[in-house]
From Swiss-Prot:
Pfam families in the cross-refs: DUF441 (PF04284)
GO cellular component terms, semicolon-separated: plasma membrane
Entry membrane topology: Multi-pass membrane protein
Species annotation: Sodalis glossinidius (strain morsitans)
InterPro entries, per database record: UPF0756_TM
Membrane spanning residue stretches: 16-36, 53-73, 82-102, 114-134
Name of this chain's protein: UPF0756 membrane protein SG1722
Keywords carried by this UniProt record: Cell membrane, Membrane, Transmembrane, Transmembrane helix
UniProt-annotated location(s): Cell membrane
Top-rank lineage group of the source organism: Bacteria
Length: 150
């Protein structure tokens, strides 16, 4: 391992931040990336970069939808949610956040220079404030409202 490699130093620093903050999500994610980077699996980084976000969103969606699929959250409970103001507000906010995420994807594609800042900010938010790493898309969406998509 070449400790003068800036990329490795950044990853090690982020892993340390995850460990210090007791955030297993950051720690495991960074350690997996380090393993990929330091082994012959490094050849799969283009695939991980291209498909990782999609796979992550699929897994996140499975986790969110599991209570409905398992029956823990009954159909009647779901239907009754349309009658409560908090649930209706949650629906509106869900639509807004999804829209922001879409803007975020566009911004990250059209202005790749902002990606590093968004990623570092998200990792810091996860590590220091016990957030969850869904932030880059939403952060990019919010940023797109301020700076535009192009």
């Amino acid at each position: 391992m070449n400790f003068s490699d800036p990329t490795l130093l950044i990853l090690l620093g982020l892993a340390a931040l995850g460990i210090i903050s007791h955030n297993n999500i950051v720690t495991v994610a960074i350690l997996v990336l380090l393993i990929i980077r330091l082994t012959p699996m490094e050849q799969y980084f283009p695939w991980v970069e291209k498909q990782g976000l999609t796979i992550g969103i699929i897994i996140l969606t499975i986790g969110v939808m599991a209570p409905i699929a398992s029956g823990t959250l009954s159909a009647s409970t779901v239907l009754h949610s349309f009658l409560h103001w908090k649930s209706l507000l949650a629906i509106v906010i869900g639509v807004a956040v999804s829209w922001l995420g879409g803007r975020g994807v566009s911004l990250m594609s059209s202005q790749p220079s902002v990606v590093a800042g968004l990623l570092v900010g998200t990792v810091l938010g996860v590590a220091l404030f016990r957030g969850v790493p869904v932030g880059p898309l939403i952060a990019a969406g919010l940023l797109s409202l301020l700076v535009g998509n192009t």
